[in-house]
Amino acid sequence: MQTKQLRQQLPAGAPDAGTTLTKAVMRAASFLGISQAVVASVLGISTASVSRMASGHYVLDNHRKEWEFGVLFVRLFRSLDAILGHGDQARLWLANDNLALGGKPLELIRTTEGLVRVVHYLDATRGRI
């Protein structure tokens, strides 16, 4: 019911929340140099679904876990962007061991627990800046 009301309030031709989040996830992955296979692991969907996301033929569903993981992934990107900028520094941070996290963030985010831990770590770091 709320989804219908939300869609009725949007101007004609405006993208829905699913399309917006899907594009944000794909753009964040592109900026961070993260492969479709890793994005699939993060979202808990198939690599084929991520490929369809990239081509605009699949949209994240706000009634499924993939939605929550997508929101966390975009949050991760926004935190990295605020702390390091979206460039080589963010990619290096993801790829290198982090003593506080106990591993490489890029590997950790492939699991639910790891994604949440990395996002919380970045939120705490961002809060100090």
Question: What residue ranges belong to the model's regions?
Answer:
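Non-transmembrane "mature" sequence context
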Residues: 1-129
